[in-house]
């Protein structure tokens, strides 16, 4: 992968630990197909209220403290396709800091899938109060045309998200297990959550028969210290 600034560019060879990307659509499809084979699982949508009195809940909705200074990783991305070969599919540009920072942390991310198709994201590390940071479409358009030099392209799809870079509020309800970002599975230094979710899921499965009595799953103290 590569890291760029306004004055320098570095390529880091990590052959033993290759960067990997998972197609979320294919991932959800595989999991949903597996879940559908279990007759004791039902899916409900558009439920506004649930009765917690006789239920055990796995909750993925973070309880976010009302703190305007909380740090978020918020991003918008587009998958673009060009008529001519443009990208080096062997190198992901993990962070390009050659862009307006506006006293926060701002970078662009480029993940090539092949020579003429790539995902490009604008990413900010900031609070969510400054609306001037959120003209994402214009940021992407300017970066693609002016920094990458791509004048003609089509957009296959768009994505967006906001990842809390702080630990959510935890309740002591022994009828609820918080999972995902709500369960503190996000690495605060990177925003990465996926692998920690897999480890938490294994922990839940291993202890499912005594789920109400097990200790809360935490990231290793080493990673909490580093974050």
Predicted regions, residues:
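A conserved beta-strand/loop capping segment in the N-terminal third of enzymes
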Residues: 1-36, 40-44
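A short, flexible beta-alpha/helix-coil linker loop
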Residues: 9-11, 125-127, 183-186
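Short, solvent-exposed loop/turn segments at secondary-structure boundaries
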Residues: 16-17, 130-134, 189-193
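Predominantly flavin-linked oxidoreductase catalytic cores and closely associated redox partners
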Residues: 30, 34-155, 164-172
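Short FAD-binding loop at a beta-strand-to-alpha-helix junction that anchors the flavin cofactor
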Residues: 110, 115-117, 173-189
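An active-site-proximal "capping" alpha-helix that borders the catalytic cofactor pocket
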Residues: 140, 144-145, 193-211
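Catalytic cores of enzymes that engage adenine nucleotides and/or redox cofactors via long glycine-rich
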Residues: 158-163, 181
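Active-site-proximal substrate-binding core of FAD-dependent oxidoreductases
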Residues: 165-169, 202-227
